Amino acid sequence: MTHQAADPFTRHDWTLSEIIEIYKSPLLELIARANAIHREFHDVNDVQKASLLSIKTGGCPENCGYCPQSAHHKEVHLDRIHMMKPDEVLEIAARAKAAGADRFCMGAAWRSVRDGREFDSVIEMVRGVRELGLEACVTLGMLNAAQAGRLKEAGLTAYNHNLDTGPDYYDKIVTTRSYDDRLDTLKAVRGAGIEMCCGGIVGMGESVADRAAMLQTLARFDPHPESVPINALVPVEGTPLGERERIDPLEFVRMIAVTRIVLPASRVRLSAGRSVLNREAQVLCMVAGANSIFYGEQLLTTPNVGETDDDALFAALAPQCQLKDALPTD
């Protein structure tokens, strides 16, 4: 069951102190509470599989401290990929559908969408993906209402644009784009009637209050974001955050549980950083409310859990566990 009707769980008026109190509650109690809410809103055996295809890699003018695609981080060794052609992308999409996919996600390392040939190519990709009978999702940076309208007209299902962290910690991570810029993009997405995919990253040095503030911001959207990716920082050598220690797995489980409580109807997606979780920790995340994973050995430019390992994980969970496939990265 998935719904956002008026109920005792769905709220848009969470206070920061309320979310922090939930976050600091005993872990077993927290997981039990999150699981009860998860069962109220979702089929626990419905776990979506989604993957990202980078249609343009590297050279981004933003200075996000975690991202190897930033042109500011000169010491990062990254193979840049120029914009893929629509026929290349649609060939991969067709193979994905033949393998049972139902959603195809495309990401471009842009600061913002610019009208012109490349955006026209993305529109062509979205139309082609929809004509194949697949859902289409893109992450392209900032965009305005008119551009969101074009994507909606082309049939776009969802737009990903993460907040990254809470507003008070945001400028410690990126200074080339403001928090309000991100919120304006999300408003344009919602205004066009496109599903919102928006979450953040934990393990960047932020406080519990910063994590809570990010969730509070997401909860203010009415309705809540349809999907919320929660990423654990993957430190990449050469980036400003490249020397940070990885987040403790149980702390990541805690974040998943709080996200499920604050955003009960959203699909909570285990995203970057899942590769360092053993399968028991991943299952605990699902008990705590995660009901989507990114599938494939790479997420844009960072490593992910291998497909064979994921297949074995879900075979162990339950024969009836339903996996809604998205594109395996090429």
UniProtKB/Swiss-Prot annotation:
Class in the EC hierarchy, top level: transferase
Q: List the catalytic activities from the record.
A: (4R,5S)-dethiobiotin + (sulfur carrier)-SH + 2 reduced [2Fe-2S]-[ferredoxin] + 2 S-adenosyl-L-methionine = (sulfur carrier)-H + biotin + 2 5'-deoxyadenosine + 2 L-methionine + 2 oxidized [2Fe-2S]-[ferredoxin]
An example GO biological process term is: biotin biosynthetic process
**What organism does the record attribute this protein to?**
Methylocella silvestris (strain DSM 15510 / CIP 108128 / LMG 27833 / NCIMB 13906 / BL2)
User: Can you provide one Gene Ontology molecular function annotated for this UniProt record?
Assistant: 2 iron, 2 sulfur cluster binding
User: Which pathway or pathways does this protein act in?
Assistant: Cofactor biosynthesis; biotin biosynthesis; biotin from 7,8-diaminononanoate: step 2/2
Designated name of the protein: Biotin synthase
Give the EC number(s) under which this enzyme is classified: 2.8.1.6
Occurrences of domain Radical SAM core (ranges): 45-274
Family from the record: Belongs to the radical SAM superfamily. Biotin synthase family.
Subunit info? Homodimer.
